[in-house]
């Protein structure tokens, strides 16, 4: 009996030693396959590594570096193991399928890969980001005005890091919107109009030789009998910039640019009045034949603008509500962000006007 017990204890000891050794070896293997050197042993990772080298996560004044695992592998037990298991597909694609073994293939799959990572981070409330960054540790008052606004908004709205910080360590995918959306907008242009109707250009248009009218501008039809409707454009002139008509005094949302003939043809509807900054404004209007098709409902143009926002802007950050900024602030903000996308000038102009017409200081949303 004693012999059997000793044999049993011996087997138990061997099992403990083998199990413990196996556990330690597994831990060692998991740790070793999580370091940056292992990640870079795959040829396909050389491209994202070069992108990462140009970011503050690689080099900064604090001397703190975020390695691959810091961003891509959660620290907690099961999430950690699941991440390691899912990463096995990368080894398969590297050595078997060759899915991203060239620059062209990598770019073709960049959006798919990026969206996979964004989805994982969203699902974990950006857990790997929060292992270094937390709202509790932030001195928000010392941040830039824009960062303060966005971080306060994120805290109140329950947003997570990846909502706004896409493309923080690697280039974001270059997303383009299908041309069908623009063609559909053109197909919805009003085919007939009546006197008193309101119509809205969906692209830069002309009122004869008098003015160039911007997308979204409200035009009132005063004579629909001819081939080209005669429209009324109403706005505000600013002293020193008389060749532009704006939406309202003090609000620099340009409705149209006037030619010399257009300035002469203006009907002035009031005296010059100063705004709070001393700029002089007066009401004015212009009538003429609209030479281009227009929409009968401006909401169609704004729906197109929202698609532009979802396609080009949401790839880098969470949607920013139009009423987050003022009508005068939006142009420079949209221009700065739009420069990082592949939007055309016309697309950026439409999106900017959508933001302006629905800005926080526009009392009646357009």
Swiss-Prot record:
This protein's UniProt keywords: Cell inner membrane, Cell membrane, Electron transport, Heme, Iron, Membrane, Metal-binding, Transmembrane, Transmembrane helix, Transport
Give the transmembrane ranges: 7-27
Q: Where does heme 1 bind?
A: 39, 42-43
Protein's cellular compartments: Cell inner membrane
Cited InterPro entries? Cytochrome_c-type_ET (IPR051174), Membr-bd_4haem_cyt_TorC (IPR009154), Multihaem_cyt_sf (IPR036280), NapC/NirT_cyt_c_N (IPR005126), NapC/NirT_cytc_sf (IPR038266)
The UniProt record lists the keyword Transmembrane helix: yes
Keyword Cell membrane listed:
yes
Q: What does this protein do?
A: Part of the anaerobic respiratory chain of trimethylamine-N-oxide reductase TorZ. Required for electron transfer to the TorZ terminal enzyme.
Alphabetized PANTHER family for the sequence: CYTOCHROME C-TYPE PROTEIN (PTHR30333), CYTOCHROME C-TYPE PROTEIN TORY (PTHR30333:SF3)
Its recorded name reads: Cytochrome c-type protein TorY
Q: What gene is this protein translated from?
A: torY
